[in-house]
Amino acid sequence: MSLQKTIDMTSNLREIYESVPYLSIKYDTYFSAYEALLQKYVDCEVTVVEVGIFNAGSLFMWRKFFGSKARIIGIDLNPDAREWEKHGFEIFIGDQSSDSFWTDLFQKIGKVDVLIDDGGHTNRQQIVTSHYAIQNINDGGLLIVEDVHTNYFREFGNPSRYSFVNFAHRIVDGINSRAYALRRTYAQYSSRVYSVSFFESMVAFQIDSRLCKQSVPTSNNGASRGVTDFRYQGAVTNALFLFKNKFASSGSVSARVVKRGIDMLLSFLSAAETIRYKKYFKDVG
């Protein structure tokens, strides 16, 4: 695989990337995403952790980008990475797929503001890292996982039901479970992850427990003109729902039979409706 550098001189982060003295490899599409996600932390007292030091080029890039107030921490498997401590970085050696490593690390460094996973890119490494990061990132912080295109590589054990990308999709499902209409108890991650952003080869999680609350419908109590809602006018499914609701409070055998029959009919109608639009899924990829 050939790696090509594309320099966009309008990107401050790219200019920094090109100016640092030590090697770093980043895909050219990452810079605009990083600037959009991370600009708010520039010149702030933030703790930034990067998994995967390599030749430390990115550590120098982050220091210059975030500014002198930032605390930059690097994690790597290679003990030789400790040499970068003399440049003012905090370096920890360990396996990102190890539960005990993360437990011990966060006991030592405390909560962080930004964690960037540029480590080994396996499903296990990305998922274990995300699990512990989500619990230990401050409200208002970010978890960013790079190079998730490996989730589509056979040599990385994919495609897999348990890929990191599918893990991220499940978190999205959990976020949507906060909707009042679903009336579900949402999972652990949904109480910490406010939103998930997908970029090419990158996934970003916005961590903020303050915003992770169950949503409820509201009204501005403005004047109503009694406008008819045409969304469901004439829809067979809507008529069936209304008919089913008439039996909602009844626990009789006949009511249960009617509700079960309506559910079966609704499932059939839903499958028939799917045929009309599933062709558009072909354009997704």
Question: What is the role of each PLM region?
Answer:
Residues 1-114, 120-144, 149-285:
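A short alpha-helical cap/connector motif
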